[in-house]
Curated annotation (Swiss-Prot):
Any Gene Ontology biological process: negative regulation of coagulation
Subcellular localization: Secreted
Main localisation: secreted
Keyword Metal-binding recorded: no
Entry GO terms, CC: extracellular region
Disulfide bond annotation, renumbered to this chain: C12-C23, C17-C28, C30-C50, C35-C54, C39-C56
Organism placement in taxonomy: Eukaryota, Metazoa, Spiralia, Lophotrochozoa, Annelida
Distribution of this protein across tissues and organs: Not found in the saliva, but in the body tissues.
Marked site: Reactive bond: M36, I37
Name by which UniProt lists this protein: Guamerin
Function: Inhibits mammalian elastases.
Domain of life: Eukaryota
Any one GO molecular-function label of the UniProt entry: serine-type endopeptidase inhibitor activity
Alphabetic keyword roster: Disulfide bond, Protease inhibitor, Secreted, Serine protease inhibitor
Length: 57
Protein backbone atom coordinates (compact mmCIF):
# COMPACT_ATOMS: atom_id res chain seq x y z
CA UNK A 1 0.00 0.00 0.00
CA UNK A 2 1.34 3.42 -0.96
CA UNK A 3 1.15 5.66 2.13
CA UNK A 4 1.51 8.77 -0.06
CA UNK A 5 -1.46 7.88 -2.24
CA UNK A 6 -4.59 10.01 -2.10
CA UNK A 7 -7.57 8.45 -0.30
CA UNK A 8 -11.02 9.99 -0.51
CA UNK A 9 -12.62 8.14 2.41
CA UNK A 10 -11.84 6.24 5.59
CA UNK A 11 -9.14 6.98 8.11
CA UNK A 12 -6.43 9.51 7.37
CA UNK A 13 -3.62 8.92 9.80
CA UNK A 14 -5.32 9.16 13.19
CA UNK A 15 -8.55 10.87 12.08
CA UNK A 16 -11.33 10.85 9.51
CA UNK A 17 -11.53 13.67 6.98
CA UNK A 18 -14.77 15.53 6.33
CA UNK A 19 -16.53 15.03 2.97
CA UNK A 20 -15.04 18.41 1.94
CA UNK A 21 -11.52 17.05 2.41
CA UNK A 22 -9.19 14.46 0.93
CA UNK A 23 -6.43 12.51 2.65
CA UNK A 24 -3.02 13.34 1.24
CA UNK A 25 0.16 12.02 2.90
CA UNK A 26 -1.83 11.08 6.03
CA UNK A 27 -3.12 14.67 6.39
CA UNK A 28 -6.64 15.94 5.75
CA UNK A 29 -6.58 18.72 3.15
CA UNK A 30 -9.23 20.77 1.39
CA UNK A 31 -10.24 19.25 -1.92
CA UNK A 32 -9.03 21.07 -5.03
CA UNK A 33 -12.33 20.42 -6.82
CA UNK A 34 -13.98 23.66 -7.90
CA UNK A 35 -17.45 24.00 -9.34
CA UNK A 36 -18.63 26.55 -11.88
CA UNK A 37 -22.13 26.98 -10.43
CA UNK A 38 -23.36 30.21 -8.84
CA UNK A 39 -24.38 29.98 -5.19
CA UNK A 40 -25.95 33.24 -3.94
CA UNK A 41 -24.75 32.52 -0.38
CA UNK A 42 -21.48 30.85 -1.36
CA UNK A 43 -20.56 27.21 -1.00
CA UNK A 44 -21.15 25.06 2.08
CA UNK A 45 -18.02 25.05 4.28
CA UNK A 46 -16.92 22.43 6.84
CA UNK A 47 -15.55 23.13 10.33
CA UNK A 48 -12.03 23.41 8.87
CA UNK A 49 -12.97 26.08 6.32
CA UNK A 50 -12.95 23.67 3.36
CA UNK A 51 -15.63 24.09 0.68
CA UNK A 52 -17.86 21.13 -0.15
CA UNK A 53 -17.58 20.61 -3.94
CA UNK A 54 -20.62 21.94 -5.84
CA UNK A 55 -22.76 22.29 -2.68
CA UNK A 56 -24.43 25.64 -2.04
CA UNK A 57 -24.72 26.96 1.52
Amino acid sequence: VDENAEDTHGLCGEKTCSPAQVCLNNECACTAIRCMIFCPNGFKVDENGCEYPCTCA
